[in-house]
Design a protein with these regions (language model features):
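Short, hydrophobic/aliphatic alpha-helical segments
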Residues: 75-84, 155, 275-277, 351-354
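Structured core elements
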Residues: 10-13, 36, 53, 91, ...
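Short, solvent-exposed amphipathic alpha-helical segments in soluble enzyme
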Residues: 25-29, 179-181, 232, 242-243, ...
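A short alpha->loop->secondary-structure connector
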Residues: 106-117
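A generic structural motif
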Residues: 35-42, 192-194, 307-310
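Non-catalytic terminal accessory/regulatory regions of metabolic enzymes
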Residues: 167, 250-378
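Amide-donor transfer/coupling interface in amidating biosynthetic enzymes
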Residues: 2, 41, 80-81, 116-272
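N-terminal beta1-alpha1 cap of cysteine-dependent amidohydrolase-like domains
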Residues: 1-106, 121-134, 205, 211-212, ...
């Protein structure tokens, strides 16, 4: 264990990371020594540090899913090894997304991925106000016992702090059965709330539609936390960093909690379009950097693949089909004809197409409301 003045915290940064300056300042205010550590440094050098903070930003431009490419970098394998020594790891915003995609949170055996951080949704009185990126100040309630987590020790249970948030994919999502286990295990450590501490699950108190108003979740042992808001951007969040310091000074006192959950297994099924719907598969005219990034990481992992991406729309009309489809094309809502075009399914026998969509398609719902309300297309 380091002495007070020599507590070294590795500030982990990837291409596209930001807020490192604010994180340095927060660590310094807490009496810790922040040290920059880049994704392409020698991962073995991470053993020199007492703890780690993965900063916010947009690693690898959030391509594919926010945090997923960074989660596959070799540095995260070493972070996992260091966390097994009970060292504290804090992921803020994009850092939280990286921890979730790497499986370090919620903390299943072998770091199996169990939860997701998906697109924000802002819904009030049944109306979609917006999806995607949003920034505001939010009230957070610390909902666990102070000793539960490395990042709660300086706060009282039910204490409220007000800190900023700024993200596009910050909505915690998971199976209800897993959520129940996380709540019972006291891993739901910070919740969005109003000024009185109530937690109505609706915008604006819940700024991103997160399940159970989750703002931060820790792993079962309590030494790792994924937090979407930004405590480093304000002195209001300093207690999170002083908690980290105290945890290190006390010798990394983890808890004996164990997260048990039976993960469902999934298999691919053949998909057919509803006969009453028109299917549009939208291709990019320009280079699809997102597809290229995913292809490159798959090749690095040993998969010899060529990957392309299409956006899938299914349109069901109630009136004159061709006339309505023409109006939708002209609206530009579903695709931009300057850089996209309606393509076809791949016919090559060596090609497999996998359809991926959100369990709750907020983007589709927003587009439908826009076509109906803004363009008067029924």
């Amino acid at each position: 264990m380091s002495t007070y003045s020599n507590i070294k915290i590795g500030i982990i940064q990837f291409p596209g990371s930001n807020t490192e300056r604010e994180t340095f300042m927060a660590c310094t205010r807490a009496g810790m020594k922040p040290v920059e550590f880049l994704w392409n440094n020698d991962p073995n050098e991470l053993s020199e540090f007492d703890g780690y903070i993965i900063v916010g930003g947009f690693s690898y431009e959030d391509r594919s899913r926010a945090g997923v490419i960074a989660a596959l970098d070799p540095i995260m394998g070493q972070i996992s090894i260091e966390s097994e020594k009970n060292k504290p790891v804090l992921g803020i915003c994009n850092g939280a997304q990286i921890l979730v995609e790497s499986g370090l949170v919620p903390g299943f055996e072998n770091n199996q991925v169990g939860i997701a951080l998906t697109d924000n949704k802002r819904v009030k009185d049944g109306q979609v106000l917006g999806v995607g990126y949003y920034n505001t100040w939010a009230n957070l309630k610390m909902s666990a016992e102070p000793s539960r987590c490395a990042f709660t020790r300086s706060l009282e249970k039910d204490q409220i702090i007000k800190i900023p948030l700024a993200h596009g994919e910050g909505r915690f999502a998971m199976p209800e059965s897993l959520l129940d286990n996380i709540i019972m295990n006291d891993q739901a450590v910070y919740l969005y709330c109003d000024e009185e501490g109530s937690t109505p699950n609706e915008f604006p108190v819940n700024p991103n539609g997160s399940l159970y108003n989750l703002a931060a979740v820790c792993n079962s042992k309590g030494n790792i936390m994924a937090m979407m808001p930004h405590p480093e951007r304000t002195e209001n969040g300093d207690q999170i960093f002083s908690s980290m310091k105290e945890f290190i000074q006390m010798g990394n006192p983890i808890t004996d909690h164990v997260l048990v959950h039976n993960q469902e297994s999934y298999s691919l099924k053949n998909y057919s379009v509803d006969e009453s719907c028109t299917e549009w598969l939208v291709n990019m005219i320009i280079t699809d950097n997102e597809a290229v990034s995913v292809q490159n990481i798959l090749i690095q992992l040993g998969y010899d693949v060529v990957l392309t991406r299409q956006t899938h729309w299914e349109i069901k009309t109630a009136g004159e089909n061709e006339n309505i489809l023409k109006k939708i094309k002209e609206s530009g809502e579903l695709y931009n004809s300057n850089k996209e075009f309606i393509g076809k399914r791949a016919a090559n026998k060596e090609t497999i197409s996998i359809l991926i969509h959100q369990k709750e398609d907020m983007h589709g719902r927003l587009k439908q409301e826009s076509l109906t309300d803004r363009f008067q297309i029924d």
